[in-house]
């Protein structure tokens, strides 16, 4: 009975440790992913028989020569994500050391030199260490997402953030993006490259059986965490 209790306790501890070893990843895109434009202050309208005044901030009027690119809270910008990163590192080291020493006992008190030779002492040592290491990583991220201006900074830069979700089969995929856009980098198509966005944060996450298949099993994670090798 005691053995069964110990086995049950060990199994429970194993499951608890395995469940706690891999916490869900923390999001890197912080804050809201959208914003609505503020309501304009409506001044009393002076409408005549032909002329009908429309508030410029209501979205019903835009000047003929007004810039159509995003510049206010609530405006949208299309981000073209084209991220290509590659990094590699290689190190090597070598240490070699050797030494030897021999001590002999001279003839003493007429003793046989053959006997004295047995009392000679010699020692030698050698130490050698070689190490090599190399690692590399390559990442490609290509996507398109339309984000919303959530804040206009004092210098005119635009803080943008957005999210796009897609339900594919039995899983869900989501793309999140946030950063600071310089309005001068926005082209006439109201798009900007992700490489021109400051403080860019990009996420691509998924749920479902495809995402679960990419994760290591809990038992494998447990043995990997306790293995000394």
Swiss-Prot record:
A Pfam family: FlgH
Membrane topology of this protein: Lipid-anchor
Compartments, as annotated in UniProt: Cell outer membrane; Bacterial flagellum basal body
Any one GO cellular component localisation term in the record: bacterial-type flagellum basal body, distal rod, L ring
GO molecular function per UniProt: cytoskeletal motor activity
Residue positions bearing lipid (S-diacylglycerol cysteine): 19
Biological function: Assembles around the rod to form the L-ring and probably protects the motor/basal body from shearing forces during rotation.
Family to which the UniProt record says this protein belongs: Belongs to the FlgH family.
Subunit organization: The basal body constitutes a major portion of the flagellar organelle and consists of four rings (L,P,S, and M) mounted on a central rod.
Protein name in the entry: Flagellar L-ring protein
Species name: Ralstonia nicotianae (strain ATCC BAA-1114 / GMI1000)
